[in-house]
Amino acid sequence: MRRLGLAVLLCLLLAVSATAAPFVEGEDLTPATKPVRGGTLYLALTASPQSFLFYGSLDNNAYTVIGQTMTGLVELHPVTNAIRPGLAESWETSPDGKEVTFHLRDVKWSDGVPFTADDVIFTFESFIMNKVAKGNSVDRFTILDTRDGQKKEVRWVKVNDKTVKAVLPSPFGPFYMNLSHAYIYPAHKLESKIDKNRPDSVNELWLTNVSPKDIVANGPYRIASYVMDQKVVLERNPNYWRVDRFGNQLPYFDKLEYLIVKDAEVRLAKFIAGEIDYMAVSAADFPTLKQKELAGGPFTIFKAQPTQPTPSPVHIAFNYDVTNEQLKELFRNTEFRRAMEFLLDRERIIDEIHNGLAIPGAGLVLPANKAFYNPKIEKIMRPYDPAKAKAMLDKLGLKDKNGDGIREFASGKNVEFTLTVQSTPQDYQDVALVFKEDLEKAGIRVNLQILDSTLVGQMFGAGNFEAGIRAFGNQPDLELRKAIWQPGTQLYYWHYSALDRDKLAAISANMLDWEKRVYELFDLGSITTDPTKRKAIYDEVQEIYHDVVPVIFVCKGMNLSGANKSLGNVTQDKEGIVYFATYTAFRK
């Protein structure tokens, strides 16, 4: 097997040292024969990026572009998620697990300036640990000190120009996984532009109106040009440090062009016409595209079990802090949320909306993630059972007393709420319609509110909603989703009263009893380094989530994608995993 299991990976991370890795890309991502260099790779974005600074944005389209231009001290293998050296070619861990010394590669930024330890220190101090940077990672590098029970930041020390040391309050199991998402930025380009009296000024750096000449990269590509609402053009980073097995500097393509295509049907048409080389395929389009492929179409359509963060699994949330006091009490009632799960027809949603190309639930951990998945949740997850749901609602005192088909509270007011959902992707709306239909059959009125995705994000971020449908991508380690699933964190949006939003600190007194346990488990998972013990901790988290249903996980779509047949080095292995990386693909 080419894939390194996460359990093995975590064991490797506990080793005292990591040996220096060569600059040569692995054989699983490079072709068996020497490829042709040059040309342009065409991909698509669903909207214009809002920034070219990872830490100054909360925008998936920006993240997609930045992921091609920036990297961190360590990286995730683009397909298997295995940890591997990045800008740090090697590292050693102290016997107590509290100090990690990183040896940096002797490489240059795309403008020719040497990469040094100053860039690492600058990035952590100015962006990653800056609480007012939009995309900060304060939570990922703030660790519980087991000696006094206080949360403390990881401290970074410059040893010399090519060596940095991380000093941890306690051993930290997911440290390297978190580092893989910590892109390093250039001090020589950005430090002088930050207003020291206004820490949030970092959010104004490298906006999309900045000249590409002022933006440098340490990843395979650098930004060449940007035309708003049309395209982002990247070009090969002349100083990229990775090579293939033949000694060729990567990437193979001269350019990577992201076409900004907001309409899904237009994106599909461009893919069929060969104007987009590789893209995710919807379940609705999969059957037609597969038929076209089998009929001799110029593309290959892939289907695989879910292994990647996207497509994000949809969930349904109820706002515990809603202003309506009757709804607030109801939404905080575990029996009500369990009844709502019994009214969720996952089989119908998977069959009718996803063409059978999805798996139920799969919100916290994917079944393919053997290192962390807890199969017990499959027995806890409630099947569609309207009769049982109605009986539970009756027991809660929510009955239709006047015979109009709508249940009432004890006060006589109708049991109804607004379900907010973004207009795209279409399957969000479709799930909302199915859920609304079944709830109304059970006597609960649902007012569907469909809005622009940006507005919905703002509403959820402000806690200004009653119930909603949202989705967050899975990650190989639950630590990477701690800011979502741990109560009292920035993206635990259905119960913001458990968070001091000014101090970004949890308010335990405002948590429900089971939330306090989940909070404790996430902190325990962070400081536990033994893989078996970490799995047991996250097993309990999964069991709690599926028992008390803080949110109702709907389903997770399979990995569906399409590649132009002129695109080289796109393969699928025996396990169904599709191997594709922008810097090792080439034009045949």
Give a label for each model feature.
Residues D28, T46-T64, L87, V113, ...:
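A structural "hinge/loop" feature
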Residues L4-G5, T19-T33, E75-V79, E92, ...:
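Extracytoplasmic/periplasmic ligand-capture domains
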Residues V554:
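Active-site-proximal polar cores
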Residues A7-S17:
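Bacterial N-terminal signal peptides
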